[in-house]
Amino acid sequence: MRKKLAKVKVHIQSLDSLLSSMTMPIIGIFIAWGLLASFFIPSGWTPDKNLALMVGIGIQYVIPTIIXFFGGKKIYEIRGGVIAVIIAIAVIAAGQTEAFTKIVGQKSVMFLGVMIFGPIAALILKHTEKFWIHRIKSGFEMLVNNFYLGFLGFALIFPSFYLSIYLIGYIQLGLKLLVEIMQQYKLYPIAAIVIEPAKVLFLNNAINHGVLTPLGLQQVRDSGKSILFLLESNPGPGLGLLVAFLIFFFKRDKKLSSNAASSSPIHLFGGIHEVYFPFVLLKPVLILATIAVGVVGNGILQIFNAGTIAPVSPGSVIAGFLQINKTPLDVAGYALALVLSAVTSLLISLLLLSLTRKKQLKTLQEAQAQVAEMKQTPAKKPRQKDTPAIATKIDFSQVTFVCDAGMGSSTMGAAIFRKELKNQNIEDITVINKAIVDLKDEKVIITISQLYDRVKAKRADATIYTINQFLDKQGYLTIIEKIKNEKN
């Protein structure tokens, strides 16, 4: 049963990775588009009818096409991206038809459609051409490959077009009605019951980019802003929890308190929420605190009718104020939600830590023992081929940090690791970071323990080191010592 649950978790996290890989690389485009909207739409700072045309073109055509390209590229590299763009043409056109408008009630931004059908088209291309791609006569590769991609894309346009009208149409109608019900009956606060536990299970990207972003962008198109972008990205709950750990363990556990202190600015200003997830996992009852605080924060946002004009990603307070709709109520609502959710999270977390102090200490000891045990597992040890007499020498010239999206937390961990290598005068090791889906032939990998199963499934023959979190400096020092011993 446990193995089945582990497999389900891996599949869900893989879906999360695919969804985030379509949107995370183009956050800069969302920011630029959001600035265009904030300046030039009729309700913007400097309305301009002509310049506002760029806003509509960007949200209707450009952004969905790029999302589809990245979705296909993650499945089958450039060829997968190209066929996904062909499918995006069909999906976007479907959202402009009268049949779709009759179902949904309006023309729609087709993010959901391109996120589904783009990767599916790339999968079909990948698994059909593998049977004959290596049999092409020399000199005909370009001709055959391009014609096959073109003909297959042409064939897939038609099912994608009609499925987008009817299947995606009714899905979007259902989601639209759900959002309208939440708005009408003031139900946004209860969204925290789903969002906060899912974040701790590293499904934050799936929720934010797979669900809230497409719905939010549709709301922006209709009303100029959306509260949905703020439901997952509010850094208040995590900030309060980290400060609670800093205070509660200041004398009890200096190392844990120090980790919480160093994680707080990264969480608040860097927008990397993953840094507080391990603290919740040390004491799972704190999930109740994050849920309660999420309800408080979302409630304040709803009372003030606050919203942003574009996705808040990463979930930084800087990005939040940059994208917030520029009216006094919106700005005040966001600021108040941030402050009160942080304070409430601090108080509830301190209360729960105090009430369960003995259990907490025991849990911390068990967690430390578990980490120590992980360091002795094959995942921590340099892997060797099954050769009884001669050990295989490991190539440490490049170390790859791996996280789900390959952007936020792994970038931070790689930077810390580079600094520790520099402090020890080790200059012959290159440190890079990647997403799990981008792994190919890496020899040495560092990741967090929660992602070990997925990394192992992708690169079973690599040397994989796991750490408790990407801010674990002591874990990095331990790995560096092992690398030095292996090299010597």
Curated annotation (Swiss-Prot):
Sequence intervals crossing the membrane: 27-48, 53-73, 148-169, 179-199, 290-309, 332-353
Domain PTS EIIC type-2: 15-362
Catalysis: reaction(s): D-mannitol(out) + N(pros)-phospho-L-histidyl-[protein] = D-mannitol 1-phosphate(in) + L-histidyl-[protein]
Disulfide bonds: none
GO BP: any one term: phosphoenolpyruvate-dependent sugar phosphotransferase system
Keyword annotations of the record: Cell membrane, Kinase, Membrane, Phosphoprotein, Phosphotransferase system, Sugar transport, Transferase, Transmembrane, Transmembrane helix, Transport
Modification type Phosphocysteine: residues: 403
Domain PTS EIIB type-2: 397-488
Active site: 403
Alphabetized PROSITE patterns for the sequence: PTS_EIIB_TYPE_2, PTS_EIIC_TYPE_2
Spans within the Cytoplasmic topological domain: 1-26, 74-147, 200-289, 354-488
Keyword Phosphoprotein annotated: yes
Notes on the domains: The EIIC type-2 domain forms the PTS system translocation channel and contains the specific substrate-binding site. The PTS EIIB type-2 domain is phosphorylated by phospho-EIIA on a cysteinyl residue. Then, it transfers the phosphoryl group to the sugar substrate concomitantly with the sugar uptake processed by the PTS EIIC type-2 domain.
PANTHER family documented for this protein: MANNITOL PERMEASE IIC COMPONENT (PTHR30181), MULTIPHOSPHORYL TRANSFER PROTEIN (PTHR30181:SF3)
Protein name: PTS system mannitol-specific EIICB component
Organism whose genome encodes this protein: Mycoplasma pneumoniae (strain ATCC 29342 / M129 / Subtype 1)
Taxonomic lineage of the native organism: Bacteria, Bacillati, Mycoplasmatota, Mycoplasmoidales, Mycoplasmoidaceae
Gene that encodes the chain: mtlA
